[in-house]
Amino acid sequence: MTVQSNNKLASQVCEACHVDAPKVSDEELKELIGLIPDWVPQVRDNVMMLEREYKFKNYKLAWAFANKVSELAESEFHHPSILLEWGKVTVTWWTHSIGGLHKNDFICAAKTDQLGD
């Protein structure tokens, strides 16, 4: 992954998303995931999601990162699932209102990556 490609997404702002907003197409998924290759598309309960696991030296560092992700979520008005474990945080982005992936999820994933820098 290049920093430049990640910044292309991270510099964007999430748009308000409604129930009738379009999910990303298969073609868009391939293009966008190429900008954030550490993220893995997952399907759970027939819902496509983006997931990434971050590793840390201890619980306190993982906790601090989870708090940063929470602050990002509040600032973007877009909220992921955050699983905090000893030395590990798993972040999962998807758009609840459309039951799948929207461009906002990729923007937030790229911004999440920058929190670790």
Curated annotation (Swiss-Prot):
Reactions catalysed: (4aS,6R)-4a-hydroxy-L-erythro-5,6,7,8-tetrahydrobiopterin = (6R)-L-erythro-6,7-dihydrobiopterin + H2O
GO biological process terms held by the UniProt record: tetrahydrobiopterin biosynthetic process
UniProt xrefs under InterPro entries: PCD_sf, Pterin-4-alpha-carb_dehyd, Pterin_deHydtase
Keywords: Lyase
Domain of life the protein comes from: Bacteria
Keyword Lyase: yes
Recorded GO MF terms: 4-alpha-hydroxytetrahydrobiopterin dehydratase activity
EC number(s) per entry: 4.2.1.96
CDD domains reported for this sequence: PCD_DCoH_subfamily_a (cd00913)
Top EC category: lyase
NCBIfam families: PRK00823.1-1
Entry's family note: Belongs to the pterin-4-alpha-carbinolamine dehydratase family.
Protein name stated in the entry: Putative pterin-4-alpha-carbinolamine dehydratase
Source organism of this protein record: Colwellia psychrerythraea (strain 34H / ATCC BAA-681)
